[in-house]
Amino acid sequence: METIGIVLNVGTDSVEAFERGFREHELPIWEDFQGRGVLLMATLTKLDISTKPAKGAVQYLVSVVFAGPEGHHLHDADPRFNAWNQIADQYQVGDGMAFGGATLLSVGV
């Protein structure tokens, strides 16, 4: 398993458009990858707690657990993701943060 965590800083004036776009563009990719056994679990979370808040932004945590490291590469090479990523970049204020690696322990997945 490989776990990826991304924190996005979405401008307060773009929250509705971002959430709508995420449902329209990214959610179908997750469903496709889960159906193919590539993705085990994924969540989009609006953060209430952050040690690094961004002024003028609502922060979101994207958490994805792939069956293996190839899932992350398949996702990032998917043309649907690349199209959504260009749209989503317009909603962000400031840099996001991305983390990932081999999952060491897991409960429930």
Per-segment meaning from a language model:
Residues 2-11, 41-81:
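Short, well-ordered beta-strand segments in beta-rich or mixed alpha/beta enzyme
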Residues 38-59, 82-109:
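Glycine-rich beta-strand-turn "strand-cap" elements at beta-sheet edges
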Residues 1-2, 24:
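A generic alpha-helix surface/boundary motif
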Residues 14-44, 82-85:
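Short amphipathic alpha-helical segments
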